[in-house]
Amino acid sequence: MSYYDPQGVIPYVIEQSPRGERAMDIYSRLLKDRIIFLGTPVDDQVANAIMAQLLHLESEDPEQDINLYINSPGGSVSAGLAIYDTMQFVKPDIVTTALGMAASMGAFLLAAGTKGKRFALPNTRILLHQPAVGGLAGQASDVEIHARELIRTKRRLNEILSEHTGQPYDKIERDTDRDFIMGAEEAIEYGLIDDIVRHH
């Protein structure tokens, strides 16, 4: 299978060919049309699948756009940054489209699409906030190291968001200090997306 599904519920489609019928999982079928679907929280396994698909589609045709559809509550910062770096690394333009919810790292990846090719469906909710940290425990020196790393990561995420949205760094820093929820129209004004898609 080409995609990680934690619930194990992956629809299959039947494809007709001159050699007969063939069953194919929906994510593999979408991949044939250069569509990658991020519909889960972002973790290392999901990130590896998405990075592999991005690299595969680049090797198939480095000139044709790749479409990344996002309906994700976010997740791991390191996994999300790995996807982000791969999106910036590959040659094709990355068309991002949010549907449902693009929260946290989901919103970050939405904004990371190619400028002019970042979209949302009309009722999408987009949420920005600062990276979360679990309960830190251990020696004080270890907690201090992790706290410094969290601050450095937050700064880097805000720099990247500022670069992709055109918003001043200070505004991004203020807005991500708490949950900052936007609709599609507000996301256009903010610079996270470029347009709202109403019809295919």
From Swiss-Prot:
GO terms for molecular function: ATP-dependent peptidase activity; ATPase binding; serine-type endopeptidase activity. It is an enzyme of class 3 (hydrolase). InterPro entries: ClpP, ClpP/crotonase-like_dom_sf, ClpP/TepA, ClpP_His_AS, ClpP_Ser_AS. One of its GO terms (biological process) is protein quality control for misfolded or incompletely synthesized proteins. It is found in: Cytoplasm. It catalyses: Hydrolysis of proteins to small peptides in the presence of ATP and magnesium. alpha-casein is the usual test substrate. In the absence of ATP, only oligopeptides shorter than five residues are hydrolyzed (such as succinyl-Leu-Tyr-|-NHMec, and Leu-Tyr-Leu-|-Tyr-Trp, in which cleavage of the -Tyr-|-Leu- and -Tyr-|-Trp bonds also occurs). Keywords: Cytoplasm, Hydrolase, Protease, Serine protease. The active site is at S104 (nucleophile), H129. Transmembrane segments: none annotated. It comes from the Bacteria. GO terms for cellular component: cytoplasm; endopeptidase Clp complex. Coiled coil: none annotated. Its EC number is 3.4.21.92. CDD domains: S14_ClpP_2. PROSITE patterns: CLP_PROTEASE_HIS (PS00382), CLP_PROTEASE_SER (PS00381). Signal peptide: none annotated. NCBIfam families: clpP (TIGR00493), PRK00277.1 (NF001368), PRK12553.1 (NF009205). Fourteen ClpP subunits assemble into 2 heptameric rings which stack back to back to give a disk-like structure with a central cavity, resembling the structure of eukaryotic proteasomes. Cleaves peptides in various proteins in a process that requires ATP hydrolysis. Has a chymotrypsin-like activity. Plays a major role in the degradation of misfolded proteins. Belongs to the peptidase S14 family. This is ATP-dependent Clp protease proteolytic subunit. The lineage of its organism: Bacteria, Bacillati, Actinomycetota, Rubrobacteria, Rubrobacterales.
